[in-house]
Amino acid sequence: MTLLFADLCAIFTPYRWMIEHVTTKRGQLRIYLGAAPGVGKTYAMLGEAHRRLERGTDVVAAVVETHGRNKTAKLLEGIEMIPPRYVEYRGARFPELDVEAVLRRHPQVVLVDELAHTNTPGSKNPKRWQDVQEILDAGITVISTVNIQHLEGLNDVVEQITGIEQKEKIPDEIVRAADQVELVDITPEALRRRLAHGNVYAAERVDAALSNYFRTGNLTALREIALLWLADQVDAALEKYRADKKITATWEARERVVVAVTGGPESETLVRRASRIASKSSAELMVVHVIRGDGLAGVSAPQLGRVRELATSLGATMHTVVGDDVPTALLDFAREMNATQLVVGTSRRSRWARLFDEGIGARTVQESGGIDVHMVTHPAASRASGWSRVSPRERHIASWLAALVVPSVICAITVAWLDRFMGIGGESALFFIGVLIVALLGGVAPAALSALLSGMLLNYFLTEPRYTWTIAEPDAAVTEFVLLAMAVAVAVLVDGAASRTREARRASQEAELLALFAGSVLRGADLATLLQRVRETYSQRAVTMLRVRQGASTGETVACVGTNPCRDVDSADTAIEVGDDEFWMLMAGRKLAARDRRVLTAVATQAAGLVKQRELAEEAGQAEAIARADELRRSLLSAVSHDLRTPLAAAKVAVSSLRTEDVAFSPEDTAELLATIEESIDQLTALVANLLDSSRLAAGVIRPQLRRAYLEEAVQRALVSIGKGATGFYRSGIDRVKVDVGDAVAMADAGLLERVLANLIDNALRYAPDCVVRVNAGRVRERVLINVIDEGPGVPRGTEEQLFAPFQRPGDHDNTTGVGLGMSVARGFVEAMGGTISATDTPGGGLTVVIDLAAPEDRP
């Protein structure tokens, strides 16, 4: 059949692509991951393309960003290129991936660089990775590149390290779902040398890059993040492989130490001992507490809380699992975590005690298989009764055996030794005690059997005439009847008390579990973390949160953890319905008992609440953004209306005066009116410039080019821009500015720095009339501080930060001093250059604005 189908494909050449497209599977995604730009991701991608071309694979390039690197561009030779599709936006044309052209060409492999790229507005999809999904669905293999800083889950960490917010992001799930992720890694020193030689950026950008993003510390931290992230993905892939192949044996690919604790006084000793064992082999440490599903062997929450705090302080993770058989639950958890070592505590027990009960530690060692077990003794180790360590099934069998054995033993002892000393009343009391023992062990049914057997043995062996079923004395008959009745009645009472005790303990354990899950939510755990905690606690293969919207035929997977998760209710081994039938918690693994479902129903409700809380937070965020935008619009209209009317009115009056024929103006008056017109136009120009800058900052399109900027030149250009064309007050105001910056140099964008200084000096001249405005600068270690100092009225203490908010003016009494955007624009420009700006009081009165920028690594 396969050969025939291939022959048909060869014959019908015009339809060959259609046949392959219909019958092919989804394409594979291969990603080259790097810690920073310039490590060689694109170079490695092109090298892989040439290797595949040599093997006869049909490879084309759709998007390859060479960034002007000659070696990279040379590797493009010999690879077919698919022309980009151009998208027009704001009067410019931008090249983007042409998905339709790729689908029409339908190669075996396509190269698409920079997977996290944001498409130009007007494209079919907002993000390039969404374009790639369409190509993969068509059965085409895609090779792409990603930098670690673009992963959504690591974005905040990278921003904290580098001080730069990454605008282009890609969901972690997209990269995790790739068929292959290969790390392209070089040392920070090698990358900096490559950068210095001009192999990454153009020569004019090298100094700025080396002193900012490409600092050795930044690169080292980014490299560590990339290595750890990839190690976690390799670990997850290994776990999935072991689950798919049903491998339960321990693979010592990575050292992991699991320590079992009860919450007793010995637990802290066990955790510290396990921490020392883990530190010697640089192993991961996990602390596990087993909760008995039957409610036995409980522990107080404060004791367990102290153990949790200790585990956290030692860098360990705390886990809780549910199981009736403690050794089995421990070993199942250890095998699931692929642990190599298990630490358990044991009490010092006598030889007789070990003879009748081998204990949890001994059973754990016997069943551990390839896991190394460390037995740690401690004087305060808890000694649970042997009966509490017996599984429910074993207790059930033992109670029925006791119903047969206990009366028989009592009868034998009584006949052999006690008969000649006791009467029928004392002998009946012995059997009565035996029935109580059986009731405590197994409940009403075994106790009833024990009472019946006790009556029969008492009648046959100890009642006259003996060894017959006949009862000669009426008193004996009454005694036996009363024995049976009282034994059964007391057994019912004892069983009820024992049941209530077990229910109370079980309720306590359920409360402990609910507190555990609720604590995770209160500590800010997301939905995936909560589901992972449920999966570990109940030893499930996978847990899925499913949402079935009203009227929908299929459910929507909100979140899932584990391997091979369920995607619908019918395929789940355990399905927990939440309230209104909208949410379901689906579990794949062992089927859970009814007592576990009670807790899980509450947990599933918490999970559904997290989903709804997240949605409400998003809606609230959108509403807040709309409200802020509306408030900003009203503030803008209120502030700008005056600043537009005032210069326009002044210019109109001046022009009207000059055009009148009734008055003959002197040359001096004419010059003054023309100066008024010029000053009004300058005010309007400055207002429009600030509005445009504010909108550019809000849109996030400011891309500063950081290089060595000499502050003396920047200040002089700022003064020129302020005084250009100015007359009267502004002309005299420029003369009040005293500059003392020496030969200070900062890493900055010269144009942006000029605008910042111009806004700050202009602001000082406005609000400190007739006062000297001083501008000085100096280097402090790796930073350059620029001070703009005035001796005017200053601002009220505690309101300094308000200066940098849009449409805020010192005092904010009227609109005669400007729209209030200058300081806001200055802060936006400074932060875009990686610096900070702040305001403080000038000693003796006034305001000092401090700009903090990076200094070049090498002094000039």
From Swiss-Prot:
Pfam families referenced in this protein's UniProt entry, alphabetically: DUF4118, HATPase_c, HisKA, KdpD, Usp
EC number(s) stated in the UniProt entry for this protein: 2.7.13.3
Ranges for domain Histidine kinase: 639-857
Reported modifications of this chain: Autophosphorylated.
Membrane topology, from the record: Multi-pass membrane protein
Catalytic EC class: transferase
Swiss-Prot/TrEMBL catalytic activity: ATP + protein L-histidine = ADP + protein N-phospho-L-histidine
Transmembrane segments: 397-417, 429-449, 477-497, 511-531
UniProt xrefs under Gene3D superfamilies: 1.10.287.130, Backbone structure of the membrane domain of e. Coli histidine kinase receptor kdpd (1.20.120.620), Histidine kinase-like ATPase, C-terminal domain (3.30.565.10), HUPs (3.40.50.620), P-loop containing nucleotide triphosphate hydrolases (3.40.50.300)
Subcellular location: Cell membrane
Necessary cofactors: Mg(2+)
Keywords: ATP-binding, Cell membrane, Kinase, Membrane, Nucleotide-binding, Phosphoprotein, Transferase, Transmembrane, Transmembrane helix, Two-component regulatory system
SMART domains linked: HATPase_c, HisKA
Superkingdom as given in the UniProt entry: Bacteria
GO cellular component, one term: plasma membrane
InterPro entries: HATPase_C_sf, His_kinase_dom, HisK_dim/P_dom, HisK_dim/P_sf, Histidine_kinase_KdpD, KdpD_sf, KdpD_TM, P-loop_NTPase
GO molecular function: ATP binding; phosphorelay sensor kinase activity
Modification type Phosphohistidine: residues: H642
Function of the molecule: Member of the two-component regulatory system KdpD/KdpE involved in the regulation of the kdp operon. Functions as a sensor protein kinase which is autophosphorylated at a histidine residue and transfers its phosphate group to the conserved aspartic acid residue in the regulatory domain of KdpE in response to environmental signals such as low levels of potassium ion, osmotic imbalance, acid and nutrient stresses. In turn, KdpE binds to the upstream promoter regions of target genes to positively regulate their expression.
Family membership: In the central section; belongs to the universal stress protein A family.
The protein's name: Sensor protein KdpD
Species of provenance: Mycobacterium tuberculosis (strain CDC 1551 / Oshkosh)
Gene: kdpD
